[in-house]
Amino acid sequence: MIRLGMLDFDTSHVVAFAERLLHKNVPMDQWVDGAQIVVGCAGDSKISPERIPGYVEAIKKLGIPIVDKPEEMIGKVDGMLIESQEGGVHLERARPFLEKGIPCYIDKPFTCSTADAKKIFALAKANKTTVFSSSSLRYTPE
């Protein structure tokens, strides 16, 4: 089982991803096997700070322990989900994990600049790990 950490609780993706990985509160056809969220860190948010307390409570109800600092997850995880809605913080949020060779999924927006994106990929390459992002919005008609 792949142990995942989750960082920055300012988006509904935090709960949606956790429920699917933990097989809780969603239909069986939405379950995702092979990995579980084993620890989280709420982080902070300039965009949506008011959302964090509710998501912290939802994550706690799913049985996921919460740590105070992102670095506390190192050694407890095999991969990271960087969830902040603030693309401008993703480089610094991913850096400690990438430097330890921990693969990172970075939610949209991946970054707010080409320079940050290049730095993230360079960190991943230098530490022989993987980084990726994805968005279902590419398939929407608008």
PLM regions with names:
Residues 1-100, 118-127:
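N-terminal glycine-/serine-/threonine-rich beta1-alpha1-beta2 phosphate-ribose binding loop
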Residues 111-142:
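A contiguous active-site-proximal alpha/beta segment in oxidoreductase catalytic domains
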Residues 5, 105-106:
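Conserved Rossmann-like nucleotide-binding pocket used by diverse enzymes
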Residues 100-102, 134:
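Long amphipathic alpha-helical scaffold regions
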Residues 68, 106, 131-133:
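Hydrophobic residues in well-ordered beta-strands that form the structural core
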Residues 101, 108-109:
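Short helix/strand-capping hinge loops at secondary-structure junctions
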Residues 11, 110-111:
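Short, glycine/acidic-enriched loop or turn micro-motifs at the edges of active sites
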